[in-house]
Amino acid sequence: AIGSINPNTFQDQIYKYGSFGNPNEEVRQRALQHMFDSIAIMNAANSRDLSLWFADGSNHPGTANIRHRKQWFTECLQATHAQLQPEKRMLVEYKPFEPAFYHTDIADWGMALLMAKASGPAAKVLVDTGHHYHAQNIEQIVAWLLDEDMLGGFHFNDRRYADDDLTLGSIDPYQVF
């Protein structure tokens, strides 16, 4: 078995306006097919987790219908979840900004929690310690997710506000303990 499978729905130019949040249904279907292919790889590799991070969002007010994008995301995540075999999990990661700066479709842990709950029982939230607003209490987020049985895992890095993916403990070694 290997670790989690991380589908890439952001690098290809077809995703420049998003993947699951894209207003073009053909693009959303392509992203869904990529998820299904990733699940097939996950099953073949005997991996437990499908780890999802989306770059989807917008850079300027009025350029995206945020409610439609939320609905499309919910539909696509539900369709992805429906393809999971028993004992497999789908982890939904959030990020408040970057690459989009006006809005990201799954911007914080609350949005990820709602999306995961709407997706199905095998969906959980993935906490990346570099994906938070200034002064946000990550320990409190983890406690809430644990209490709701919705904590799926972590991506640890030591750059809390800009996601530079620094090695855990490189800035503040005491935070590891």
Stretches with model-predicted labels:
Residues 2-7, 13-124:
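Active-site acidic/histidine proton-transfer and metal-coordination neighborhood
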Residues 92, 125-130, 156-157:
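Active-site flanking residues adjacent to catalytic metal/cofactor-binding acidic residues
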Residues 64, 102-110, 131-177:
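Gly/Pro-rich active-site loop or hairpin
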Residues 8, 37, 130-131, 176:
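Broad hydrophobic/π-residue packing in well-ordered secondary structure
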